[in-house]
């Protein structure tokens, strides 16, 4: 009898975890971010993203994201921008026009830094001539650590962050949308170039189940 008392909670927990179907993708994300300084306190940025599923086998998303940012203190800035997304979905592509506003910070801690952002998005999506509007808020927080001695000619940094996306209704976050967890490295490739590359684990709530993405993500930053 005691054996069944211990087995019942285990069976119950297993059943709960399997209520939602699980799907997995192994993807590759590539992006280029170009920055142009208008002044000491303002910067224009253009992001272009190409995302593929099953590494390079299938197109997933294209993104174009222009924005402008303004420093509001020694360690903080505000930004606003627009994103166009084209996503490969069954039957037809889903197109999205997205306006967003962001507060971001980066605080030095000795040779390391603590960084993050809060981004608010207004999203207009179109698929099969059906229009939908939604909004969400994104919270990212992370750390950047040096992994070599100070003054070394080769000085990559370890970058770790987590970002949670929440859908918004009547002005308040109310529903989990997705979560990103990233572990990778960033290194300067010259005075104007730096590369951020690493592994990103993404969990997306699809309603009837969860989609898990294992992503190798690489971003090349270029300052004009």
What are these regions (language model features)?
Residues 48-54, 82-88, 107-109, 120-124, ...:
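Transmembrane beta-strands of outer-membrane beta-barrel pores
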Residues 36, 70, 105-107, 145-147, ...:
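Residue-level signature of outer-membrane beta-barrel architecture
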Residues 1-26, 224:
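Bacterial Sec-dependent N-terminal signal peptides
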Residues 22-79, 86-88:
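Start-of-domain marker
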Residues 103, 212-224:
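Outer-membrane beta-barrel "beta-signal"
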Residues 117-125, 129-166, 222:
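Detector for outer-membrane/organellar transmembrane beta-barrel domains
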Residues 26-28, 60-62, 95-99, 131-139, ...:
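Residues that define the transmembrane beta-barrel architecture of outer-membrane proteins
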Residues 41-46, 75-80, 110-114, 149-153, ...:
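Repeated loop/turn-to-beta-strand initiation elements of outer-membrane beta-barrel proteins
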